[in-house]
């Protein structure tokens, strides 16, 4: 039986702490789950790694001191304050000048997508750094009927593939990073190469008393973009929040979304000693 003391929790946001079925502006963490996360964060670090941007996350995860935003392009370390959190440090995994230049490319991609009548009903989410640079886009069709998902996935991916191929042509080739998913109903485009493995390393580097092998770190996620972080964490748990989705996850364990709060409560009550038995109790 695996037994491991959890010294820090790192979690994805969308689809993990909030079900994927929820769209932007309605996806707040349920009260009971937020309460246990807040209680845990007073005892061990709870950090977030997300494709969402800083402005979005700051309002949603008040229990987290470290927010790795836009797939790790920007990581913000906060200091607690009686009234509101204050930014202590910003860490960029890309050159700010390159981000500024590529932001215009992302704007052009967004305009191209929205100019097509067949995509007029899709959501295009713009993701900005804390100083206002556009660094990511998500084209999202989760609110459409599942019968239409495969059509939008194929059509959007074809359009983006053509645009990215054109961007790579001389005389001035431009690279953007595209994150695709096997079953999730959206696609992400970023202005710099990024992944949650790099974001994970950045977050852990800001924490104390974490061993170099990351054994004491528990990571929670729900999609393929979490795989690089799953592979680094000592304990990796995939969260199943939407029965329509069948992502290929490189995690050691799984929990249904409805079991997550119970698991975290049991983990805290057990002094943060993780075991297979504890997980099974939460699943019962």
How should these model regions be labeled?
Residues 4, 190-284:
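Mg2+-dependent phosphoryl-transfer enzymes with acidic/Ser/Thr/Gly-rich catalytic loops
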Residues 5-23, 200, 230:
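Asp-based phosphoryl-transfer active-site loop
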Residues 2-11, 31-44, 166, 215:
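A short, Lys/Arg-enriched amphipathic alpha-helix followed by its capping loop at the start of a domain
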Residues 20, 27-126:
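Active-site phosphate-binding/coordination module
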Residues 17-25, 184-191:
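Glycine-rich phosphate-binding "P-loop"
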Residues 112-218, 224-232:
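Conserved acidic, metal-coordinating active-site core of Asp-based
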Residues 6, 43-44, 64, 71, ...:
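Short, well-ordered alpha-helix to beta-strand connector turns
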Residues 11, 48-52, 220-222:
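Short His-Asn-centered micro-motif
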């Amino acid at each position: 039986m695996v037994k491991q003391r959890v010294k820090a929790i790192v979690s994805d946001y969308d689809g993990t702490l909030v079900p994927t079925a929820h769209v932007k502006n309605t996806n707040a963490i349920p009260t009971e789950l937020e309460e246990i996360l807040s209680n845990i964060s007073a005892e061990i670090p709870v950090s977030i790694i997300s494709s969402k941007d800083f402005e979005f996350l700051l309002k949603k995860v008040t229990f987290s001191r470290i927010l790795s935003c836009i797939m790790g392009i920007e990581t913000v370390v906060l200091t607690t304050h009686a009234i509101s959190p204050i930014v202590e440090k910003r860490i960029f995994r890309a050159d700010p000048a390159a981000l500024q230049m590529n932001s215009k490319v992302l704007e052009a991609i967004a305009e191209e997508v929205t100019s097509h009548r067949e995509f007029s009903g899709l959501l295009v989410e713009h993701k900005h750094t804390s100083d206002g640079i556009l660094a990511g886009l998500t084209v999202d069709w989760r609110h459409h009927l599942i019968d239409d998902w495969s059509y939008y996935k194929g059509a959007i991916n074809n359009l983006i593939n053509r645009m990215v191929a054109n961007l790579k042509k001389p005389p001035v080739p431009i690279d953007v990073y595209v994150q695709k998913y096997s079953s999730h109903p959206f696609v992400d485009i970023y202005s710099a190469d990024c992944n949650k493995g790099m974001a994970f390393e950045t977050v852990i580097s800001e924490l104390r008393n974490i061993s170099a092998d990351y054994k004491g770190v528990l990571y929670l996620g729900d999609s393929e973009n979490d795989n690089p972080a799953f592979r680094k964490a000592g304990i990796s748990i995939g969260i199943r929040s939407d029965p329509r989705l069948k992502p290929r996850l490189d995690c050691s364990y799984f929990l249904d979304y409805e079991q997550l709060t119970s698991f975290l409560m049991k983990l805290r009550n057990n002094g943060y000693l993780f075991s297979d038995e504890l997980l099974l109790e939460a699943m019962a």
